[in-house]
Regions:
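Short, solvent-exposed loop/turn and secondary-structure capping segments
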Residues: 37-41
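Penicillin-binding protein/beta-lactamase superfamily catalytic region
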Residues: 59-65, 74, 92, 98, ...
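Acidic/histidine-rich, surface-exposed loop or edge segments in extracytoplasmic proteins
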Residues: 5, 82-83
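Active-site helix/loop module of the DD-peptidase/beta-lactamase fold
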Residues: 1-33, 63-66, 92-131
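Solvent-exposed, acidic/flexible segments
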Residues: 16-20, 54, 73-77, 81, ...
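Second-shell loop/turn segments in exported
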Residues: 10-14, 45-48, 69-74, 85-90, ...
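Active-site SXXK
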Residues: 1, 26, 84-88, 141-148
Length: 182
């Protein structure tokens, strides 16, 4: 459970449903929270834009209205992805960008033309955005597609497990939105 990886944001109450949220639930956006889907993203009152400038993002993400048991319902929700950025930072001893550079971007040859790291936005507290804000060129994005086609292998390195690629490219939960969710 994510509660074991970032316990400061979770309750000690064993009955609290949030303590059942796993990394898989967060990765698949099935962690159980309600996210208003009736807003148009360009609307300045969209919850994403209101949430974007908040310093207490993790607390806000976890203290929203509950919708379904974790793992049972897909809701496109960038807060679950952002929470993963916090998990990476707090458990790897490096920022999400440094971790991605070491384990993914640099092995894939993904850098700026001057050789520096890619551009990735940070939230008000310094965590890298987990759900958006990463700037890549089409050629750099194509490398991810090729990595998936090669089942996680890049040249002579296995960057992500073939089991993960298999799981990530198959349906995880039935969704009501055609073309969204895996």
């Amino acid at each position: 459970p994510i509660s074991e990886l970032m316990p400061e944001f979770f309750s000690d109450d064993p009955e609290d449903w949030r303590n059942e949220i796993s990394l898989e639930h967060s990765l698949t956006m099935t962690w159980g929270y309600k996210w208003p889907g009736d807003y148009i993203l360009s609307d300045p009152e969209h919850p994403l834009w209101l949430w974007k400038d908040e310093a207490e993002r993790f607390e806000i993400a976890l203290n929203r209205e509950w919708q379904a048991d974790p793992g049972t319902s897909f809701v496109y929700d960038s807060t679950s992805s952002h929470f993963l950025s916090g998990v990476i930072t707090e458990n790897s001893g490096m920022s999400t960008l440094d971790y991605a550079n070491q384990h993914l971007f640099y092995p894939l040859g993904i850098r700026q033309p001057d050789g520096s790291s890619v551009v990735w936005n940070q939230d008000p507290t310094g965590y890298y955005e987990g759900g958006f804000g990463l700037s890549l060129t089409p050629r750099q994005m194509a490398k991810f597609g090729y990595l998936i086609l090669k089942k996680g292998q890049w040249e002579d390195q296995q960057l992500v497990s073939s089991e993960w690629v298999e799981s990530a490219t198959n349906a995880q939960v039935d969704v009501m939105l055609p073309g969204k969710g895996m």
